Amino acid sequence: MKFVVSSNELYQQLQTVAKVINSKSSAAVPVLENILFSLSGAELTLVAADQSNRMTSRLSVESLEGDGSFAVRADTILNALRELPDQPIELEVREGKANLVYSNGHYSFLAIDSDSFPESIAFDPEHSIELPAPALLRAIESTVFAASDNERRPIMTGVFLDFFEEKLVAVASDGRILVRYTDNNIKSGQQMSFCLPSRIAALLSRYLLVKETGVVRIRFNQQNVSFELPHVELTARLLEGKYPNYNSVIPPSSTHHITVDLPLLISASKRVALFASKASTLIIFDFTEGSARISAQDFDISTSAEETIPASGQAAGSLVRIGFDYNCLQSLLQSFAGEQIDIALTDQTRAGVITPLQTEEGIEICTLIIPMKLIGE
């Protein structure tokens, strides 16, 4: 087989599919160190996989001789193409040898048999939905940062996608914070749910969905899910287990509701947190009607900071004092758009609910943060 393709286009597609390769999987199954090339007419299909996931990309080439398939070590072909300026290249494979010819030279490397490469997973065509790629991107970006990295509870290390007939709910939590993102614009017409590993969610949000404006087709079964875009498809194994009832942990009502300017709160918290204990990163909020005082202290090195910003709303006419982990709080605040947020509190031992007051039409965002115990209180 022989074909001609743009070196830059091939390199970019190889870079994308190679992101699914996992060094642990390839050590256990050496064939997974490779990328599979399959030529059919003028279409070249590239496939990379680990033991749980698989990514496929397609691009157009100029076929010069025959169809077929072979596999090449990912690092070999990527390193070779990385050093080339963009130009047409010719790739020919004969008797286990690949020869890549460019304007003033050539590379030769092994082309192994493709038969040992893992086969694709079959899905029931009835178990599929379609939704706008930008909508899925926003749902993942708004939640994935809150997922846990504690492998002792695998189900919490992913993004839970809960499809209803009239909406999509995306949830992630690490036990200290929780994000529930609801898109009422998504009308899938069916009810299903699955938990997507954070690594796969990150691949989707950082590389596959970020420039897509069309539709993504989602196919699924009990163990796997597939995200199909015009020129690339990602198949992943789902996290096993039952996701906790996320609605049950969000307080239905709160005694105090305080409205704060979001940019002011982010910048003030950042300045005060510089003087917080490095071990706890605790910052304390004292809310009254009209103001929010933010303070932190590091007893070990005798440093402290305090700053007051405007606040409005109902503080029940008395002081509301509560402590939060700065890193947890900041991760929530930086995920919001808009200018103002509502902070709903009951007392210093119960979770705070933070919601942005400005969102896109049909979008609801609710976040939860567990308070930290205040010493001596």
Place the predicted regions along the sequence by residue.
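Structural preference for solvent-exposed beta-strand-turn elements
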Residues: 1-377
